[in-house]
Amino acid sequence: MRKIIHVDMDCFFAAVEMRDNPALRDIPIAIGGSRERRGVISTANYPARKFGVRSAMPTGMALKLCPHLTLLPGRFDAYKEASNHIREIFSRYTSRIEPLSLDEAYLDVTDSVHCHGSATLIAQEIRQTIFNELQLTASAGVAPVKFLAKIASDMNKPNGQFVITPAEVPAFLQTLPLAKIPGVGKVSAAKLEAMGLRTCGDVQKCDLVTLLKRFGKFGRILWERSQGIDERDVNSERLRKSVGVERTMAEDIHHWSECEAIIERLYPELERRLAKVKPDLLIARQGVKLKFDDFQQTTQEHVWPRLNKSDLIATARKTWDERRGGRGVRLVGLHVTLLDPQMERQLVLGL
């Protein structure tokens, strides 16, 4: 049985700012955007979250919720330095590390001899070491599979951890809301609820064929997760090549104004996800995806050095006009392709 830890730093960017400037600790702060121009919140500290300020929220909305919010532009070199230090701490316990972004990672400690092989104690020691060496707090989840470890890391935030032992998995899954499973969005959750499926326990009683007919490949993933099955390894060689966000509509759309409104809502989430992986927002390409009512889909992208909403909207409009052919659109997606590390080094040297 595997021992997987998911470590997630607590409001990481904001925490680095509060550590380096103690005057910020007890006031609402957020990273990203400014009062003078439009932007989105990358992360917010817990005092700001009490006012409803959240990641990917437009700055204007955040300021309405919390007029005295302190906005910081972000010091991404400092965040990267802290992230590298945290990664080095992980490596003291295992070589099997899969970074997901600057502030979270999976660790496979199945074969680790530290702390007498106890994943629970390893997670505690890692969190304490991070605090001792960086004065930053982390939350952790421990489980026999990746998706449960990720869910567990959110159970006792901030500065806590939650353990799901192999023996506890069946009972935990019985009442686990399907919306907690990574990949189950609002639209999918609504469709599942309409079928009477709210928890993993409900799905366990459902026929796999029914799920496959309704959800395709995702139906199998949903069925497996509800049984506690997740055979994905912690991949130390994992190199993220793209970042994307998409939305499947409850009803097909037929007007460009509807598509543009969806892009406006998707863009802040794309920006937030990209910032966690590439704080400087440098990219190789960006593009859009439309899936039509006949389940055919089309993708169009441009070479572009930095994430740019205006270009994405223009690309989407061109795709809408030239490729839709009067069909309804059931899905809208935005994505970016990240720079190859070697190419990125060459660009930096060229500067």
Swiss-Prot record:
Quaternary data: Monomer.
Function text: Poorly processive, error-prone DNA polymerase involved in untargeted mutagenesis. Copies undamaged DNA at stalled replication forks, which arise in vivo from mismatched or misaligned primer ends. These misaligned primers can be extended by PolIV. Exhibits no 3'-5' exonuclease (proofreading) activity. May be involved in translesional synthesis, in conjunction with the beta clamp from PolIII.
SUPFAM superfamilies per record: DNA/RNA polymerases, Lesion bypass DNA polymerase (Y-family), little finger domain
Family: Belongs to the DNA polymerase type-Y family.
Catalysed reaction equations from the record: DNA(n) + a 2'-deoxyribonucleoside 5'-triphosphate = DNA(n+1) + diphosphate
Compartment list: Cytoplasm
Enzyme class: transferase
Biological source species: Escherichia coli O1:K1 / APEC
UniProt name for this protein: DNA polymerase IV
Known EC number: 2.7.7.7
